[in-house]
Amino acid sequence: MKKFTQSIIGSTICNLALAYIVFMLARLIFFFVNYSYFAPYMDSSLAWDMLQGAIRFDTTALLYINGLYILLALFPLHIKEKKGYFLFCKIAYVVLNSIALAGNLIDSVYFQFTGRRSTATVFNEFSNEGNIAGIFLKEFFIHWYLVLIFVVVILATWKIYRTPSVSTRFNKGAYYIKHSITFIIVIGISVIGIRGGIGKAVRPITISNANQYVNRPIETAVVLNTPFSIIRTIGKKAFETPQYMNDEDMKATYSPVHTPSDSTLFTPRNVVVFIMESFGKEYSAWFNRHDHPEEYPGYMPFLDSIAQHSKTYRYSFGNGRKSIDGMPSVLSGIPMFVEPFFLTPASLNKVSSIAGELNNKDYYTAFFHGAPNGSMGFEAFARAAGFKDYYGMTEYKADDDRYKPSDYDGTWAIWDEEFLQFYADKMNTFKEPFMTAVFTASSHHPFVIPQRYNNHFAEGKVPIEKCVSYSDMALRRFFDKAKTQEWYNNTLFVFTADHTNESHHPEYKNELGIFEVPIIFYAPGDSSFSPAYHEDVIAQQIDIMPTVLDYLGYDLPFVSFGSSLFDSDTDKSFAVNYNNGIYQLIKDDYILQFDGKSAVGMYDFKKDRLLKENIIEKVPQQHEMEHFLKAVIQQYMQRMNTDQITIKQ
């Protein structure tokens, strides 16, 4: 046995087995770091299925990652029989597998914010962040235990790695025959492993194949590994137009084109949109007063007080899981399907927004975000979507009478309290009517607040909750100033979150809860605007654009994938989102899950909040919902690929 492990072929097999162990160890760490997302639904049967899937995906990733090492180790040339060459092979092996391990460990933390494994677009998401090195350094200190695990595993890998013994005496003919045959066999096995199987019916496995090993889409993150998810999505076209139905049927079933009636009368009111970083519904007492209110003390008391005098919705959802998903959804009515719109070639399409449409009515429009200009691609999207001006950290710092170095949080942006005061003061200088939007920043990882407030806000059960309370206080201070201004009573205020964040209640950790965000419309100066709490309407972020334009009486056609929440026909309301290769449609009492080919899940979410009872093929609404969702997907993909997300003039 010792002789075999010291041979080139034997040592290579041993080292690949070691790589398998490291991949599986990383998966166990991922599982236990995110234990509360998976444990309530886990049983032995599911665990066995997931293990089978994990081995399949690890095989593909392992062969991708170790391809260079395998080539170096097994290439049939006798001149490689040298200590220096074998040391080079060892270094290549350890470095490549270290990168893979790092990706898996990083995703153990990042998953809590995205609900999925990272894909190739992750490199573009942070490409505009000038402080990315500082952010990573802070994360290393916060998650020191993962850094320690990484170092220990890499040192152990270096120690356990099997280096073949150097052969000085061998028959060259036999050597080349033996090693050539081995090399050809290994190449063949590697091709099969990378594809995920053998046979004409087997297509190269993709992320979506993970769904066959799980009961819930979110569980695919355990089956997958980060290297596979990244490698398999490099260069992949995000939007493929399906042919579920002919165009006539598609348009009759669903159309994102909104055509107001000829009798519509436009009223030029101001519009102010707040995209509150990570303000998930879980942190609200108002939105959780129905079920176990004692478990929801609430960390956004001011926004809750606004909600009581607004039009709000018990069932309201985001259309993505990241900040770069939230902005197109809220302002342009574009949901996130497959990959963030920002990061796809479709981002070069002509795109509109609330601002872009209101420019047609001579509005002044501006977007505000306290991070460095260019951060997250927000400035680029704001300008493409029609905002006339952008106010970021550069503009804030240019105000010498206002700016102090302590106004910067040290990681991401200007503190919300200071920046929202800047926002209010700037709006006081704008000519009416205006439309503005602000994207807050302080309720964000690494979950810190100004030192002067360290003992001011309750800690909560997860670190973000005190940050939500701080940003809520900053919002209250904004309104203390804004309500004294002349423009205030002629303004519609809209509030939502970009996405959800840390959770500690099980109902907010499943495929529905991870998308639950508040949607609030507040018009303090409009006596005809009646506050209402709707329990019969499904609301989503992409409804905000058509709802705002409907409220104003906008009389020009436009494209938005949502619908007006002020439409009296509640049967039209729905929500869509996408995660881990699964499309979701929320309509009436049900949530339908669809993998692009067929329905894989159906739940009565109003009765089954934890989504434990899959009632697929048991309710008559399923097939109508599936047909509707197919029409939405086909419209979306077709319009993205043909640049039809605006009305052509």
Q: Where do the model's predicted regions map?
A:
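Transmembrane and membrane-interface helices of multi-pass
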Residues: K2-L224
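Short, function-defining helix-loop hinge/capping sites that tune catalysis or transport
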Residues: Y35, N66, G115, A285-W286, ...
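Short, hydrophobic/amphipathic alpha-helical patches that form generic packing surfaces
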Residues: G53, L101-N104, F228-T233, A631-Q635
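Short, motif-level signal for alpha-helix interfacial/capping segments enriched in acidic residues
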Residues: Y85, Y254-T259, R476, I582-K587, ...
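Residue-level recognition of alpha-helix termini/interfacial anchor residues
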Residues: F140-W144, Y423, Y453, E617-H623
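Soluble catalytic regions of membrane-associated enzymes that act on cell-envelope
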Residues: G199-S560, S568-S573, N579
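Membrane-interface soluble catalytic domains
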Residues: I205-T206, D526-Q649
